[in-house]
Amino acid sequence: MRSDDVKAGYARAPNRSLIRSLGIDESEMHQPFIGIANSWNTIVPGHTHLRVLGERVREGITAGGGTPFEFNTIGICDGIAMGHEGMRYSLPSRENIADSVELMIQAHKFDGIVCICTCDKIVPGMLMAAGRCNIPAIVLTGGNMLPGNLHGCELSLTDVFEGVGKVAGGTMTEEELTELETAAMPGCGSCQGLYTANTMACMTEALGMSLPGCAATPAVYADKIRLAYRTGKRIVDLVRKQILPRDIITPASLRNAIRVDMALGGSTNTVLHLMAIATEAGVPFDLQEFNRLSEQIPHIASMMPAGPHSMQALHHAGGIPAVFRQIRSHLENCQTVSGMDIYTIADSVKYVDESVIRPEQSPVHQSGGLMILTGSLAPDGAVIKSGAVQDEMWKHTGPARVFDGEELAMKAILAREIKEGDIIVIRYEGPKGGPGMPEMLSPTSALVGLGYSRVALITDGRFSGGTRGPCIGHVAPEAAAGGPIAFVKDGDQISIDLFTKTVNLNISADEIENRKKGWKPLKRPLTGVLARYAAAVGPADLGAVLQ
């Protein structure tokens, strides 16, 4: 066992003495040492219940014949961090979490690890650590929040963000907004729709790194507590059989994750995170794989925010196993941490609510819900949630309205300075330029709330999974790296064509070269973690991992 490095032989008597001080019994000393990386805290709604799940995981590990040791990592709520300086710290926290879990695994020589996590950057951060350390691992995702309800209508956090735009537009009062914000979020769990946290939970299950049914089970259901116990028992089996993350996270399982992502129409952030997970697991992966698979996989579930269905509805419709069944012919048969392969899980499904998870013969859209765009504005790629774009905006040309940062753009939007047909460009919000690649949910939600229907938004920053509409993010190279987006001027014509997967700046290459003369990138004063992050982070098209 790996843990023998800290507990076997007379030379390790001091180490054992410290372990015995924890109350560890002699019999426990000879069992596999299993780490539990929890991310419980009392500020993130998706994480407030994780202490209970951690207790149940410990019980499962003990029942399975292992010795559990629990520790904590940080966790940031993107929704609370949204719209202010705090958003710049969210993506860097992913690397902090991956590093923290690695540090604990390697310092204490755990034989296996259970990762308990729910929200946007915590799930990929822990998956990155699992792939990097490559000891037996299972991820337990914490589950989704139940939908809110007001006057008989189901609600999610996006309704509140869009309510801000409605107040600015005069179609909602501040009192009505207060009533909405109070009703929208009824308890613990990840935000209710197929936003980034829930999409990453689905990706985790599709990769094979969590037990079947885990992704869509709501946070407050007893099933989630049972899944925690089973996860604890199962990790001990994985240790004994030495089934490792790199046996599970393979080119084929990553392709399966993308297929499920396309079928559901998940968050654009999955592109960034799956690339990072692949890098940490040592799997070569190309950004264009997303487009290739998108053309093969129909979009079969109309999930919030683009559609009506919550994650609770997805759970009752059969969850990710039901998605496997509906697109089984497209999936590759990979092993999972459960001991069952993907086909076995798909074939074990007894019921699918096809009003939620449609058969591929009658999809929401014929192709997948995400798309990689390239062109003169994004030579190294950009991402759009095509499944959330209205038909009339699949091909659009309009004048650029350029803003060096989200705050300036938000002021212009709320002041109604944007016209229908405009293409808003928000730059210097990339991995280095932001730094931290903040999400642009506030401006996109304000546009919806104000009633705009023909305004596109392009950025080298990111979008929340709650974003809908013609919003193109992750533009690479970013402005801070001298990408073409740095040289766009107000009034330049930009063409977006989702049919050809292109986004082009309609000026000549010579004009771009002229604009480069004397160019100096916007520099924000940085200290601490953001300064270190900006100096070390790589480009978005490679997952924005530290170099």
UniProtKB/Swiss-Prot annotation:
Q: State the Gene Ontology terms under molecular function.
A: 2 iron, 2 sulfur cluster binding; dihydroxy-acid dehydratase activity; magnesium ion binding
Q: Give the modified residues of type N6-carboxylysine.
A: 121
Q: Which cofactor does it need?
A: [2Fe-2S] cluster; Mg(2+)
* InterPro entries in the record: Dihydro-acid_dehy_C (IPR042096), DihydroxyA_deHydtase (IPR004404), DiOHA_6PGluconate_deHydtase_CS (IPR020558), ILV_EDD_C (IPR056740), ILV_EDD_N (IPR000581), IlvD/EDD_N (IPR037237)
User: What keywords sit in the KW lines?
Assistant: 2Fe-2S, Amino-acid biosynthesis, Branched-chain amino acid biosynthesis, Iron, Iron-sulfur, Lyase, Magnesium, Metal-binding
Q: Name one GO biological process term.
A: isoleucine biosynthetic process
**Active site positions:** 464
Q: Which Gene3D superfamilies match?
A: IlvD/EDD C-terminal domain-like
This protein's pathway = Amino-acid biosynthesis; L-isoleucine biosynthesis; L-isoleucine from 2-oxobutanoate: step 3/4; Amino-acid biosynthesis; L-valine biosynthesis; L-valine from pyruvate: step 3/4
Residues that coordinate or bind [2Fe-2S] cluster: 119, 191
> Which residues bind Mg(2+) per the record?
78, 120-121, 439
- Highest taxon of the lineage: Archaea
Q: Name one GO cellular component term.
A: cytosol
UniProt catalytic activity: (2R)-2,3-dihydroxy-3-methylbutanoate = 3-methyl-2-oxobutanoate + H2O; (2R,3R)-2,3-dihydroxy-3-methylpentanoate = (S)-3-methyl-2-oxopentanoate + H2O
Q: Which PANTHER family match?
A: D-XYLONATE DEHYDRATASE (PTHR43661), D-XYLONATE DEHYDRATASE YAGF-RELATED (PTHR43661:SF3)
The protein's assembly and partners: Homodimer.
- Tell me which HAMAP family the record gives: IlvD
Question: Into which family does the record put it?
Answer: Belongs to the IlvD/Edd family.
- Protein name as catalogued: Dihydroxy-acid dehydratase
Task: Name the source organism.
Answer: Methanospirillum hungatei JF-1 (strain ATCC 27890 / DSM 864 / NBRC 100397 / JF-1)
